[in-house]
Amino acid sequence: MTQIHPTALVDPKAELAADVSVGPFSIVGPNVRIGSGTRIGSHTTVEGHTTIGAGNNIGPYASVGGVPQDMKYRNEPTRLEIGDRNTIREFTTIHTGTVQDRGLTSIGNDNWIMAYVHIAHDCMVGNHTVFSSNAQIAGHVEVGDWAILGGMSGVHQFVRIGAHAMLGGASALVQDVPPFVIAASDKSGNKATPHGINVEGLRRRGFDAGQIAALRQAYKLLYKSDLSFDEARTEISALLAQVDAGTAAPLQAFVDFLAATQRGIVR
């Protein structure tokens, strides 16, 4: 049975599964769909053309599905889609997309989004990510599966963060982070720079020694050699041709990510 607190305002046109709960003083708009078992905390707003899947837990004072902070926005019916089993903590803001992009902001499954996080318009967030408190991503950012963003980190618009990458706390990121790479600020300032392969994270997620060794070799070619970016890509592609099929999959993801960069990679 749906549990709606007497002080909550749920529009009659909203579609809520039978066991959704909505806390005190929360607002759910007319174009919202919420799946089974999702819990909306107190003083939370869910608005816009927003679809939320099953088993999510959205904390108090969150703002989900608000209009984009984009001066080009003209009240177009753009969307926000959130998958299943996500935790979205207090004071988080997540905005719908814009027609200048896909018209969609999307968040996958099993993500852990801590307090005061901002996910802007047209962002694409994968599965199993962690956004530490106060992490802020600008419009059109892509965050791959299992990526981790440290607290108070900031990400420039259109930047991509690859799968299994890690961004250190209080870091400013203005270019792409390849998959499996750690980027963090150093003593010279808060601009994120590369700091090696996320070895510990990969071990925890079941990557074997051969896969990790191949990624380390690719990292050295990209960051620790005198090769240009294009030369490094060529050498990494040659390395890919030499490894067995089991080792090749993460290395292929690394190569594909480099080939698709538009803003360049973190240096």
From Swiss-Prot:
<dbReference type="InterPro" id="IPR010137">
    <property type="entry name" value="Lipid_A_LpxA"/>
</dbReference>
<comment type="subunit">
    <text>Homotrimer.</text>
</comment>
<dbReference type="Pfam" id="PF13720">
    <property type="entry name" value="Acetyltransf_11"/>
</dbReference>
<keyword id="KW-0444">Lipid biosynthesis</keyword>
<keyword id="KW-0441">Lipid A biosynthesis</keyword>
<dbReference type="GO" id="GO:0016020">
    <property type="term" value="C:membrane"/>
</dbReference>
<dbReference type="InterPro" id="IPR029098">
    <property type="entry name" value="Acetyltransf_C"/>
</dbReference>
<keyword id="KW-0677">Repeat</keyword>
<keyword id="KW-0808">Transferase</keyword>
<comment type="function">
    <text>Involved in the biosynthesis of lipid A, a phosphorylated glycolipid that anchors the lipopolysaccharide to the outer membrane of the cell.</text>
</comment>
<dbReference type="InterPro" id="IPR011004">
    <property type="entry name" value="Trimer_LpxA-like_sf"/>
</dbReference>
<keyword id="KW-0012">Acyltransferase</keyword>
<comment type="similarity">
    <text>Belongs to the transferase hexapeptide repeat family. LpxA subfamily.</text>
</comment>
<dbReference type="InterPro" id="IPR037157">
    <property type="entry name" value="Acetyltransf_C_sf"/>
</dbReference>
<comment type="pathway">
    <text>Glycolipid biosynthesis; lipid IV(A) biosynthesis; lipid IV(A) from (3R)-3-hydroxytetradecanoyl-[acyl-carrier-protein] and UDP-N-acetyl-alpha-D-glucosamine: step 1/6.</text>
</comment>
<dbReference type="Pfam" id="PF00132">
    <property type="entry name" value="Hexapep"/>
</dbReference>
<keyword id="KW-0443">Lipid metabolism</keyword>
<keyword id="KW-0963">Cytoplasm</keyword>
<protein>
    <recommendedName>
        <fullName>Acyl-[acyl-carrier-protein]--UDP-N-acetylglucosamine O-acyltransferase</fullName>
        <ecNumber>2.3.1.129</ecNumber>
    </recommendedName>
</protein>
<dbReference type="InterPro" id="IPR018357">
    <property type="entry name" value="Hexapep_transf_CS"/>
</dbReference>
<dbReference type="InterPro" id="IPR001451">
    <property type="entry name" value="Hexapep"/>
</dbReference>
<dbReference type="GO" id="GO:0009245">
    <property type="term" value="P:lipid A biosynthetic process"/>
</dbReference>
<dbReference type="GO" id="GO:0005737">
    <property type="term" value="C:cytoplasm"/>
</dbReference>
<dbReference type="GO" id="GO:0008780">
    <property type="term" value="F:acyl-[acyl-carrier-protein]-UDP-N-acetylglucosamine O-acyltransferase activity"/>
</dbReference>
